[in-house]
């Protein structure tokens, strides 16, 4: 399981790990997770050729039976030797509610590797008070810190964004808050330390232990502070247009409007899939209010028609997210002559109170 808060780089890391395992001759199955439907992560991973199942409508802990069913479905279809699971970025207590139940109830089917929790280094520097910048309310940060507390391995992703001094300060802050935790710094984009990380989680089993204490009232309030939006947009133009540029400009529109409303972005990610394409997609990410929208996958050729998927998570009212996305789609589309953008599906909501299917206080070796 590769966890971490929204925008930590989980999907990129999952793709890199899946590719590495596949190159070693292993069959890989991926299971993604979201509170809503139409998940960008699923589209990204399927476009890379990985057998992928999606659990929507709740986190793994609340949809535990669906997680097991997804694993069985992948087993029937492609017989994976390794499953990689990516939980919802706003969820915690996954050891007690997911990995321990898997070990206790399905230990004959699955061996559980150490749980990695990724952190975006810039976000982490702000959370630990080392640098100034936008952050979240106290109860949202409760979830963030609980994710780190339950990690078997804390992984500082995107370490290429920090120099040695800043990385050292972050390591020291994590060690002071969570003494004894193993910490790795990696960069999926540049390939830094991926071999060491992947070798560890591919060769070791999660240690036995006791579950951490979690205040579910605070946890539920923290989740409820986050607005969630998923939508799909059908694009049709009279003349082929630059899809990568459109994605970046649309992300910029959303960013500007949310910043004006004082809403902190947790993660915005969008995919554009050309009509009649061969699996190629364009992907743009935005992980903070002051972050420059970044393309993680590009479309080399201009596009005339396609489908846009938008996943937005921010500390803001869901209705505000809906209004911002509608206005931003209209604004970005109007800048492209002859482009028609029709909202096909839009849902915005706050996550419900987490109610785990199981919660085990611990497992023995």
Language-model-detected regions and their locations in the chain:
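Canonical P-loop GTPase G-domain recognition
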Residues: 141-223
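Non-catalytic alpha-helical coupling and interface elements of nucleotide-dependent molecular machines
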Residues: 26, 76-79, 103, 107, ...
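Short acidic, S/G/P-rich loop/turn micro-motifs used as interaction or catalytic elements
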Residues: 90-91, 123-125, 161-162, 240, ...
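A structural preference for short, hydrophobic beta-strand core positions in alpha/beta folds
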Residues: 30, 183-186, 343-345
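P-loop NTP-binding site
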Residues: 1-3, 7-12, 203-365
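A short acidic, often aromatic-flanked loop/helix-cap motif at beta-alpha or helix-coil junctions
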Residues: 59-62, 189-194, 277, 349-353
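Nucleotide-state-sensitive switch-loop elements of NTP-binding domains
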Residues: 1-3, 8, 12-142
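Residues at alpha-helix caps and immediate loop-helix transition turns in enzyme cores, especially N-
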Residues: 94-98, 166-170, 242, 321-325
């Amino acid at each position: 399981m590769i966890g971490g808060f929204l925008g930590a780089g989980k999907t990129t890391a999952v793709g890199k790990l899946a590719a590495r395992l596949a190159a070693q001759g292993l069959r890989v199955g991926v299971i993604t997770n979201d509170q809503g439907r139409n998940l960008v992560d699923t589209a990204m991973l399927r476009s890379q050729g990985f057998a992928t199942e999606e659990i929507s409508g709740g986190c793994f802990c609340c949809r535990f039976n669906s997680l097991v069913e997804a694993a069985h479905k992948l087993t029937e279809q492609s017989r994976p030797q390794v499953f990689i699971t990516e939980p919802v970025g706003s969820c915690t207590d996954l050891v007690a509610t997911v990995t321990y139940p898997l070990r206790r109830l399905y230990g004959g089917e699955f061996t559980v590797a150490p749980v990695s929790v990724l952190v975006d280094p810039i976000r982490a520097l702000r959370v630990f008070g080392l640098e100034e910048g936008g952050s979240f309310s106290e109860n949202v940060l409760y979830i963030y810190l609980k994710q780190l507390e339950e990690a078997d391995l804390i992984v500082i992703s995107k370490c290429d964004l920090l120099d040695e001094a800043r990385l050292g300060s972050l390591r020291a802050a994590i060690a002071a808050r969570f003494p004894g935790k193993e910490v790795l710094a990696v960069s999926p984009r540049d390939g830094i330390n991926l071999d060491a990380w992947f070798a560890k989680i591919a060769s070791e089993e999660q240690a036995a232990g006791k579950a951490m204490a979690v205040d579910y009232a605070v946890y539920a309030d923290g989740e409820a502070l986050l607005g969630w939006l998923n939508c799909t947009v059908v694009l049709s133009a009279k003349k082929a247009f630059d899809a990568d540029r459109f994605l970046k400009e649309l992300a910029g529109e959303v960013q500007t409007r949310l910043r004006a409303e004082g809403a902190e972005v947790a993660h915005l990610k969008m995919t554009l899939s050309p009509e009649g394409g061969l699996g190629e997609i364009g992907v743009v990410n935005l992980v903070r209010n002051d972050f420059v929208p970044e393309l993680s996958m590009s479309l080399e050729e201009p596009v005339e028609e396609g489908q846009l998927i938008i996943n937005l998570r921010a500390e803001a009212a869901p209705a505000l997210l809906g209004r911002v996305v509608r206005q931003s789609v209209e604004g970005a589309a109007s800048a492209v002559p002859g482009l028609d953008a029709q909202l096909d599906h839009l849902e915005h909501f706050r996550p419900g109170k987490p109610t785990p299917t199981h919660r085990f206080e611990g497992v023995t070796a």
